[in-house]
Amino acid sequence: MEVISTNTNGSTIFKSGAIPMNGHHNGTSKHQNGHKNGTSEQQNGTISLDNGNELLGNSNCIKPGWFSEFSALWPGEAFSLKVEKLLFQGKSDYQDVMLFESATYGKVLTLDGAIQHTENGGFPYTEMIVHLPLGSIPNPKKVLIIGGGIGFTLFEMLRYPTIEKIDIVEIDDVVVDVSRKFFPYLAANFNDPRVTLVLGDGAAFVKAAQAEYYDAIIVDSSDPIGPAKDLFERPFFEAVAKALRPGGVVCTQAESIWLHMHIIKQIIANCRQVFKGSVNYAWTTVPTYPTGVIGYMLCSTEGPEIDFKNPVNPIDKETAQVKSKLAPLKFYNSDIHKAAFILPSFARSMIES
């Protein structure tokens, strides 16, 4: 078997002609999280299943030249993209970093085998994580971004002319290097005079931040495993609340309602203990994330009341209060802002309980 990328959580890219075989961390025998996918061995063009049945070797279920994402956070399922070209593969001090050109979504960034952003499919995530919080407060001036080292989040934030200072704290310098090489139009924004890029630990930075300094904090983190784990714990939220001005807001990614309600409920419980303004959960659709959706926690500190569900600072063209030379928004508008807080009955009952 010829493998050009095997990541620690089991995701793999196979070259043409490569066939997954038993015993490799490619998801065909056993994931690192200990879950089997029901296959045991391959012989003579067939894949034998644990129940004694067989899949034909020419089945469309397995194809060479595809990236497949496996994770302990979504056991029993995987997401695949056809790979046109591997652009970068490396291991930083914190995680495996890979960038490839996909057939459908442009460049795809993965960290430890999990898709973080796609060039042509990730804009719903970045537009919402920025405009849900900043559209909910008038005249944001000082903002902190935790993570976001590729630069998509910063790109969206620069739509607001009231912004005076943006601090970005990215733990992984390799992610920033990938941005500079493969996304120069994004990395150029790191040179904006309002922007300070810090290579370091986001949790430590927030803990040391000046009290009541920021109008908004955006936590553009990966999943709650590996280097991002601390960004979902109560001590981190306490530090965030301290760093926000009265009536300041925070937005952090908060997983999928289809798979992670147990994680979401814990995040909400932590936030309700810390943030004395309001605590809200919103969600949106992102085609390349597990289950096709992602959630956000939106919280405010005690002070001027923040109504996240009714934007006071919208930036869509119909109600534009913000003028920008950037390209038009592709996803966000005032209606989607309001709709993001409408939850399915099962999720609403669990979150409100």
Swiss-Prot record:
InterPro entries: PABS, PABS_CS, Putrescine_N-MeTfrase, SAM-dependent_MTases_sf, Spermi_synthase, Spermidine_synt_N, Spermidine_synt_N_sf
Catalytic activity: putrescine + S-adenosyl-L-methionine = N-methylputrescine + S-adenosyl-L-homocysteine + H(+)
Location of the region described as Disordered in the Swiss-Prot/TrEMBL record: 15-50
CC per GO annotation: cytosol
Binding site for S-adenosyl-L-methionine: Q95, E170, D201, G202, Y289
Active site, UniProt feature: D220
CDD domains reported for this sequence: AdoMet_MTases
Protein's UniProt keywords contain Methyltransferase: yes
Pfam families: Spermine_synt_N, Spermine_synth
Stored HAMAP family: Spermidine_synth
Cross-referenced PANTHER family: PUTRESCINE N-METHYLTRANSFERASE 1, SPERMIDINE/SPERMINE SYNTHASE
Membership in a protein family: Belongs to the class I-like SAM-binding methyltransferase superfamily. Putrescine methyltransferase family.
Name under which the protein is recorded: Putrescine N-methyltransferase 2
Taxonomic classification: Eukaryota, Viridiplantae, Streptophyta, Embryophyta, Tracheophyta
Primary gene name: PMT2
